[in-house]
Amino acid sequence: MRMFVELLTNGSEEEKKATNKKDLSPLFSGGHGDFVHSLTAISAPHNGTTIFYALPKTMTFTKYATFSLGNILGNTKSNKSYDWCLEQFNLSSIPNKQPQYWNMFNTVGIKQAVESNDHLWHDLTLHGAKELNEKITCCNSTYYFSVAGQMTDEDMLSGHHSHSRGMFPLLWPLARAMGTYDFNDINDIPIEKSWCANDGCLNTISGLHPENEPF
């Protein structure tokens, strides 16, 4: 949503250069920051989540599973009602055109998609979130609010965190992995023990505010 407000306010230089002025969407032209009076983010990964580093194999599998599903459904008639927007990887058909059933199980395209940085999963990493934060500025006419969640309890001896009783059971392994993951830096990004508290998917500290913005 912060990117949405950024586009309304400042537009997109890439879209302006690549699109004729008469065909440019108002979303990318800028000058509409006053359309949004306030923005409330709930458990938003402002600075990314360490789950990708605590459970690398699990998250890699999740990426492959997501793009594989998009490759299958994106080449069926269902793509007309929900566009997976994976055409750049040749994984989905163009909506309102004949589905490319023969393009299902495009393993080469799936691998390229997973290894690229042009997808949501990359934006959720610490490095992807940092890249986004460098592009996004706060609009002076918009009030920003953040609501962060925590469903872990700290062990007084180790300082690590594990799931609390009220957490959804399927999130217990994720919460424990994030809460007990030992690290100091992740490729020059400083991480402290304050990152152990989480809600099962997102580090609580990351849901408070973007690192490069005041709180």
What feature does the model see in each segment?
Residues 8-15, 194, 204-205:
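Amphipathic alpha-helical interaction segments
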Residues 1-4, 41-43:
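Conserved beta-strand->loop/alpha-helix structural units within folded catalytic cores of enzymes
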Residues 28-215:
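Helical cap/lid subdomain of alpha/beta-hydrolase-fold lipid enzymes
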Residues 10-35:
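Short mixed-charge
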Residues 2-10, 21-22, 56:
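Short glycine-enriched nucleophile-adjacent loop
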